[in-house]
Amino acid sequence: RKQYDQQYINAVYQRAVSSRKTPIKDTTYFYDTIYTLPVVFHILYNNNAENINDSLLKNQLEVLNQDFRRLNADTSKTRAIFKSRAGDTRINFELATVDPNGNATTGIVRKSTSRTTFYSNDLNLVKYSSNGGADAWDPTKYLNIWVCDLSYLGQDALLGFAYPPYGHPFWTSQSWVSDPNQGVVLHYKIVGRNNPLSKGQAQVLDNSSKGRVAVHEVGHYLGLRHIWGDGTTGGGCAVDDYIFDTPNQRVRSDFDCNPNANTCNDPGAEQFPDMIENYMDYSAHFCQNMFTHQQIAAMRYSLSVYRTSLPVKVEYIQKMKVKDTFAYNDLKLFAAEGQKVIVEQRNSDLPNEMYMDVYDMSGQLVLDHYQLTKNEMWVSTAKMAAGIYVFSLRDKENRPVLRQKILITKN
């Protein structure tokens, strides 16, 4: 790994992580945010099979939201060695409700085309109505997703593709494209979970039947590379994805999801298997289930630097105004015996009730709005795994009282 790249991604990661812990300078809110991106589906069809129904598109959106928020049902399949590296991106997706002309829309646009396939030397033909495709809605305002036939000579040649943000340092300039081509393109047979056109079909389709091609391609759209860094056999371990919590991997994974694969075995370092669970691998969908924390930091960094014009909805998780900090004297938290975190109070003027939120270091909410009273001013940590947590104490007026990191240990 080049030193410059190492310094760069460290800076990106630290910026994203530290911004979850401290207020941004000159703003009133903490920066722990949830982004929601507006999506428009462009359906290009030459026959009825290609004109997939709304339910599949809405299901695809559901898959995006579940996988990006780590709400997918198969998180339990993340192997123990990687569980601490998996996290919630805090990025949501919703169908656009207003079109570029200001009119109401369902976020789904359909167009008949004379083209039997959009697989060609110029894959971007699908993005132009003059070539039988559909013009993008302003790519600085919408996440455009085109759904079309990407077959070649009757074979399912390509399942999807996307481009990274223009100028993104993880990619060479050959990978950058101008704004009209920004967005995601999907083969119609792999849209949604259990699409009948892919489930039980040829291996490449059956192993891609959980709607995660879209998850993978949106990862590219937000700047992520394949976890093997697009290296090849013989030199792949020296090629990097610029993400430090994805283990080095020589080549893409096979569909067999081999949990014992370790294609970059370094005898002098800690051993990690290939991360077949990662959405940015080519492993079968049934073993994919995670993004890593540094992948998350990189995607959120792309939204804050390279895709700033997207009109994302922003939800401030903490909803804590810095200027309204309401301090109580001699108040602190500490971990005590009996698996508790106790609020130590020496001020008789404390309110009769307070509320506690607890976050783990990935930003996930562990305990939500737990009520404390003067007779029971403590929180149980019995169900919390060992680690560092952020305890956020508020009064009944929702004013922040105290915010403190505490290390929870287990005997």
Report the location of each language-model feature.
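Propeptide-to-catalytic entry region of secreted or membrane-anchored zinc metalloproteases
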Residues: R1-P139, C148-D149
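Active-site-proximal segment of zinc-dependent metalloprotease catalytic domains
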Residues: N121-H226
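A recurrent domain-boundary module in secreted/ectodomain proteins
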Residues: Q288-F326
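Residue-level detector of functionally pivotal "anchor" positions at catalytic/ligand-binding pockets or at interdomain
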Residues: V312-I342, R346-D349, T409-K410
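Short, glycine-anchored, charge-dense loop/turn motifs used at functional sites
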Residues: V358-V366, Y389
